[in-house]
């Protein structure tokens, strides 16, 4: 029932085919309706990376809601591309604090939870579902719902599970089949991740054990040695900066003012060093087999936030109420000025 004249009008866009004809036409040409319309519901890894980093850059330059609306439209367009939705969830989690008020921030967290729930309920890829579950738990913590977070991940992330103790199995298997290249690479990756995890864990430990001075002081002593030994201030500036900042908070609670400014000075120096360079994940002379792994990460090795937003966060960190007794101290004023001047150069 399709005439040449009808097809000619479709080709010249004078008219469109009846929607009921689309399945018939698709069957005739041996393609799906999506293929017939030129609709591609799935994105490749490089496409996802580009969209993520483009949106992250726009968050630093454009009105927040304008970028959020653009990302929401992309979510609707690629609602069945679960790897993309996972990265949008990460994007929203990394930027929701820049919404104009707490109510708006909470609304974005709620949207992100809904997106993660959609992934978990519909995606067939277990690894993507597990990542979405962990993200959902993080959002629950941010929303003040710790019990819901526990219900989601307590069993999955339990240290009693064999999966949490099995990093050496893959390394040993590669070694036994003679693939020493992968064995060495995976060993370095495992060591690198455990190093970061140890410092992150110590940072959290200092935060909630501030009343136990002896334990905190010993933790700081050990972590300072570890950070220097592995040159972490150059290897992973973000982890090192967060550690020094948390120690500064602890020392302010202990009224060790000289210690506070020594740590805040390191915090500011590391942030500035991070922004002066490429600001990408990297190895060093010891961890020299990580590059391929970094390149293979879902978002590549680039920062998950734009440099300007990283600097804005650092400026906000110095406004922490814990430092209010020092607000007129020239040293704090100077550190704030350093970050402000750095912001003007970006």
Predicted region positions:
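Recognition helix of helix-turn-helix/homeodomain-like DNA-binding domains
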Residues: 1-16, 38-42
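Alpha-helical segment of the N-proximal tetratricopeptide repeat
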Residues: 46-80, 87, 94-103
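Generic helix N-cap/helix-start motif at coil->alpha-helix transitions
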Residues: 45-52, 78-85, 96, 124-133, ...
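DNA major-groove recognition helix of helix-turn-helix/homeodomain DNA-binding modules
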Residues: 20-35
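Alpha-helical protein-protein interaction modules
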Residues: 198-329, 333-334, 338-346
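Solenoid-like repeat scaffolds
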Residues: 41-42, 72-79, 117-125, 153-162, ...
């Amino acid at each position: 029932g399709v005439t040449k004249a009808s097809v000619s009008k479709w080709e010249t866009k004078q008219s469109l085919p009846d929607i009921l004809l689309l399945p018939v036409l698709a069957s005739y040409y041996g393609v799906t309706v999506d293929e017939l319309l030129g609709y591609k519901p799935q994105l490749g890894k490089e496409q996802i990376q580009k969209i993520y980093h483009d949106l992250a850059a726009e968050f630093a330059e454009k009105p927040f809601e304008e970028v959020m609306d653009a990302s929401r439209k992309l979510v609707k367009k690629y609602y069945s591309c679960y790897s993309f939705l996972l990265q949008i969830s990460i994007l929203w989690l990394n930027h929701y604090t820049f919404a104009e008020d707490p109510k708006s921030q909470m609304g974005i967290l709620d949207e992100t939870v809904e997106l993660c729930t959609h992934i978990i309920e519909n995606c067939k890829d277990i690894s993507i579902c597990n990542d979405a579950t962990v993200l959902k738990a993080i959002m629950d913590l941010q929303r003040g719902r710790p019990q819901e977070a526990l219900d989601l991940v307590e069993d999955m992330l339990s240290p009693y599970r064999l999966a949490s103790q099995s990093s050496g199995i893959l390394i040993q298997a590669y070694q036994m089949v003679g693939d020493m290249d992968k064995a060495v690479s995976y060993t370095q990756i495992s060591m690198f991740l455990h190093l970061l995890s140890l410092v992150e864990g110590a940072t959290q430990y200092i935060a909630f054990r501030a009343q136990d001075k002896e334990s905190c002081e010993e933790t700081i002593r050990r972590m300072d040695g570890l950070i220097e030994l592995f040159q972490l201030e150059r290897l992973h500036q973000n982890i090192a900066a967060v550690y020094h900042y948390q120690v500064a908070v602890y020392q302010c609670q202990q009224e060790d003012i000289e210690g506070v400014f020594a740590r805040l000075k390191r915090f500011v120096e590391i942030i500035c060093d991070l922004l002066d360079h490429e600001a990408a994940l990297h190895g060093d002379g010891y961890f020299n087999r990580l590059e391929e792994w970094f390149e293979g990460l879902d978002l590549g090795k680039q920062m998950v936030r734009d440099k300007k937003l990283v600097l804005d966060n650092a400026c906000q960190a110095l406004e922490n109420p814990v430092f209010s007794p020092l607000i007129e101290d020239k040293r704090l004023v100077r550190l704030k000025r350093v970050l402000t001047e750095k912001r003007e150069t970006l």
